[in-house]
């Protein structure tokens, strides 16, 4: 595809956002309903161009339940819009070869764009670099705005309500970045005063690393002398460096601590002179989910159950009083809060024996890294349904400061026409170990009725072993925690299995 928008350098930053229809069935794709983007001058932070359009999905069944949203997007409006194939050239022209920016775009919008181009058989646009303001601001701004969603950040800075329309949201995104950068710029100017007043601690100055060094302002400096480039004017580069270094937005987007840099390999370090001269901001690929995962590991969690010992931290059916279940907001990370579920004053963890597997593991469903989702569906007994319904009620009704438009997903799954056959999804965790995928949940097999637990080692090389052990009709003892989540316009309670005992019949 030809790219005609803007100059040959394509130096503008493309802030973009998608509005989508949330899948109603497992494995169903997201349907893009709206695309919006602005091109921003990286030196003056001035909006140079804007574009937005509603998008009609090729599969209209994906919007069969779409009603008028608070944002104003309606089914009739979507039905009268162009399909993605009809706007693909325009989207490509806006995005290809530019720096991409947006909120949670690495995990969501970038993936949806690539899927949309793949669906129509075209090569997707490729970014020069990517700036994900969710992960970036979570690192640099310290989560002072709670969950760091766009709505929470806008409320924090008094920018009004999030419109949930693509063009409005990308403009708000730019304003949020400006505000955050200004606060960080002011704090860096008088750190002894302003950082003491803040609940965010300033980051340590980076130290020397291989393939170059990191200087005080956090920008990678090439170990190669600037004189080796015949096109570089050292004097002008010095002046440009001073100007750009002091720009709060550029400082925010290029600063990188030693701990950040060590989290991923940089195969081709960018020469600092080229970086400043052309204002090509380095790619930021740190995953906000990894940061949250680290915090969760440091936070209180149920001890790993022994293979045969009684697991006292996990409550059984006769040990739970529905009236004692409550949800509460507890301190999480750098001043933010998260929801936690309790039974009286103890974190709520459950064990349930002889649950029958309704649907086993399916390789059709994978996570963002391409790993199979090791989830199973089990029949939910009446007593378990009562407890999970009470958990849903406590969590769903907990007042929070940050507004959300997430759809609440009940923990107990009740299909139309099968109300008397409720089920629940158990999440078996998977962990990456290089090229291998390991099962993070402790899995055992046990011969009934008096057998001992035998550890089942599971990796991507022998995933069939776990699949064949969890066929429909199999009975399992499950020990699980209840973890509230709110992600990609969906919220609910995840049943995260810590230990799973597969019961074998003699």
UniProtKB/Swiss-Prot annotation:
Active site: 164 (proton donor/acceptor)
Binding site for Mg(2+) 1: 17, 19, 169
Broadest EC class assigned to this enzyme: hydrolase
CDD domains: DEDDh
Cofactor: Mg(2+)
Highest rank taxon of the organism: Eukaryota
Classification via SUPFAM superfamilies: Ribonuclease H-like (SSF53098)
InterPro entries (alphabetical): Exonuclease_RNaseT/DNA_pol3, RNaseH-like_sf, RNaseH_sf
Compositionally biased tracts (Low complexity): 222-238
Positions with biased composition (Basic and acidic residues): 290-299
General function of this protein: Probable exonuclease that may be involved in enuclation of sieve elements.
The name this protein goes by in its record: Protein NEN3
Organism the protein comes from: Arabidopsis thaliana
